[in-house]
Amino acid sequence: MCHQQLVISWFSLVFLASPLMAIWELKKDVYVVELDWYPDAPGEMVVLTCDTPEEDGITWTLDQSGEVLGSGKTLTIQVKEFGDAGQYTCHKGGEALSHSLLLLHKKEDGIWSTDVLKDQKEPKNKTFLRCEAKNYSGRFTCWWLTTISTDLTFSVKSSRGSSNPQGVTCGAVTLSAERVRGDNKEYEYSVECQEDSACPAAEERLPIEVMVDAIHKLKYENYTSSFFIRDIIKPDPPKNLQLKPLKNSRQVEVSWEYPDTWSTPHSYFSLTFCIQVQGKSKREKKDRIFTDKTSATVICRKNASFSVQAQDRYYSSSWSEWASVPCS
């Protein structure tokens, strides 16, 4: 992640005494200190400067302790562990003048920590963010999992390309599901994003980048995902399934329609379909048929069910969920 360099001036609250850019501004009055995390690590020296023209009678405190850490317009601290992070405030005469929140981003053995989000391991290991699109409109949804329930905040940024980024607007992050996994509870968060100038029929040359900032208490982590819309397409299931018995035959004619959410015109944005008839027993062999049409003739026995799913006809992205209807 590319971080904006802090501008050092008399009104800045925090600046770094190291040339290695180990501190950067996440948002107003919130700073991330990047630390190599190993025993006896030296940490990072940070100098805090009070945002005031006053020079005398200034004191510093950390969080709500009230303990005076030092006096003067500046305070130099050595940040080594989470006990050194938190909200630093400068005061004069009982009045708070300015403050800054320091968060820690850990790096162990050259790898940034990934303690907040759960590895979903699909489609591969170290998959923390998953994204899907129902069509080629430039709208997509991303989600992630965590077992943490409190003191947790997320923010999301997205763009197409990184060197000359094009706009993608993301909404608010929401808690979309809660599940019990053994002895643990799992929380799913999601966000919906829309490419500002999407052209559904155009060839994608640059990938979309999604960046999630995660803060748990005083710990900061970031997670990224890069993809083309065509790679994350997953249509909604086909709709309006209907069965029509054929006279003097064990067969039925089944028909369905494209999902409402799929891109149009369908002559250009075409789907292919997989159909199957499932008997009452789940162990019973299922015969699957692939077709580009929206109807088929099958044998549909009593107590069985007919199912159909859809996939982009010209690109091997994900299949939709199944849509089903009973045979009788």
UniProtKB/Swiss-Prot annotation:
Glycans are attached at N125, N135, N222. InterPro entries: FN3_dom, FN3_sf, Hematopoietin_rcpt_L_F3_CS, Ig-like_dom, Ig-like_dom_sf, Ig-like_fold, Ig_sub2, IL-12. SUPFAM superfamilies: Fibronectin type III, Immunoglobulin. Its main location: secreted. The keyword Glycoprotein applies. Keywords: Cytokine, Disulfide bond, Glycoprotein, Immunoglobulin domain, Secreted, Signal. Residues 29-106 form the Ig-like C2-type domain. Disulfide bonds join C50-C90. Residues 1-22 form the signal peptide. The keyword Thylakoid does not apply. One of its GO terms (biological process) is interleukin-12-mediated signaling pathway. Residues 237-328 form the Fibronectin type-III domain. It is found in: Secreted. GO terms for molecular function: cytokine activity; cytokine receptor activity; interleukin-12 alpha subunit binding; interleukin-12 receptor binding. Belongs to the IL-12B family. Heterodimer with IL12A; disulfide-linked. The heterodimer is known as interleukin IL-12. Heterodimer with IL23A; disulfide-linked. The heterodimer is known as interleukin IL-23. Also secreted as a monomer. Interacts with NBR1; this interaction promotes IL-12 secretion. Cytokine that can act as a growth factor for activated T and NK cells, enhance the lytic activity of NK/lymphokine-activated killer cells, and stimulate the production of IFN-gamma by resting PBMC. Associates with IL23A to form the IL-23 interleukin, a heterodimeric cytokine which functions in innate and adaptive immunity. IL-23 may constitute with IL-17 an acute response to infection in peripheral tissues. IL-23 binds to a heterodimeric receptor complex composed of IL12RB1 and IL23R, activates the Jak-Stat signaling cascade, stimulates memory rather than naive T-cells and promotes production of pro-inflammatory cytokines. IL-23 induces autoimmune inflammation and thus may be responsible for autoimmune inflammatory diseases and may be important for tumorigenesis. This is Interleukin-12 subunit beta. It comes from Macaca mulatta (Rhesus macaque). The gene is IL12B.
